[in-house]
Amino acid sequence: MSSNYTRWGVAALVTVSLAGQAVAADNITVFAAASLTNAMQDIASQYQKEKGVTVVSSFASSSTLARQLEQGAPADLFISADQQWMNDAVAKKSVITRTRYTLLGNDLVLIAPRSAAAKAVTLDPQTDWKTLLHGERLAVGDPDHVPAGIYAKEALQKLGAWESVEPSLAPANNVRAALALVERNETPYGIVYGSDAVASDKVKVVGRFPANSHKPVEYPMAIVNDHDNAAVKAFYDYLKGPQAAAIFKNYGFTPTK
């Protein structure tokens, strides 16, 4: 396996969903956690077909997006992959507090390349990570700031494995970068969200972390300060509705009931 996994942590993943139209001043701009990439692209396309409104989405680690909002980056809606970075956005007055809404849930899984011979792994305090990794690296979101990495660290600590596993981590700048390391067979295993595994045909889930090993994986959203207009509110409501929920479910998320 190659060792150039670090280059995946250089830049945030930015994707523009234009649905065939040129970018216009009245487009809706969404800052969304990287794990939402596929689902939000599909929702943006569907919304454009139904409403004739273009949604432009930028995907990156929630920490990166929260910091960009604090610095005045133009966006209408923020969707974080954890409550911590939404708390930060609220504290910095980047978003409108009353519009905060927990939109989705997710789970935390261990993945391996689909082409690999990796077998199912029971993730508990008895898991032998040293034998499992066999001197190789474990792809994760950077535990210092990426929500997926923060959840992973919490789960590994709960299972008593953090101290032994930490030296073997291959930290990435967002969860999709961690996924890519496994897709490219640059690491034998990775910790990502269940939805990331659903979105990729190059990896397979070999283990699921117990729900009680980490805080719930939640996706809060809120409208950005001074952007509470009718068009933004309409899309905000659409994300809470049945059409968007069907797409989120298709990608492995659990919409809030």
What is each PLM-predicted segment?
Residues 1-2, 16, 56:
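Intrinsically disordered, low-complexity segments enriched in Ser/Pro/Gly/Ala and basic residues
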Residues 24-73, 80-83, 87-92, 96, ...:
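Exported/periplasmic ABC-transporter solute-binding proteins
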Residues 1-12:
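Bacterial N-terminal signal peptides that target proteins for export
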Residues 17-21:
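N-terminal signal peptide c-region/cleavage motif recognized by signal peptidases
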